[in-house]
Curated annotation (Swiss-Prot):
Top-level taxon in the UniProt lineage: Eukaryota
Subcellular location: Microsome membrane; Endoplasmic reticulum membrane
Species assigned in the record: Lamna nasus (Porbeagle shark)
Membrane-spanning intervals of the chain: none
Protein name, as recorded: Phospholemman-like protein
One function term, GO molecular function aspect: chloride channel activity
Role according to the record: Induces a hyperpolarization-activated chloride current when expressed in Xenopus oocytes. May have a functional role in muscle contraction.
Family according to the record: Belongs to the FXYD family.
Cellular component annotations (GO), alphabetically ordered: chloride channel complex; endoplasmic reticulum membrane; intracellular membrane-bounded organelle
Topology versus the membrane: Single-pass type I membrane protein
């Protein structure tokens, strides 16, 4: 996932 915003609350890649 390279289109992930600054949401470390949902995506923790």
């Amino acid at each position: 996932v390279s289109d992930v915003p600054n949401n470390d609350d949902r995506f923790t890649y």
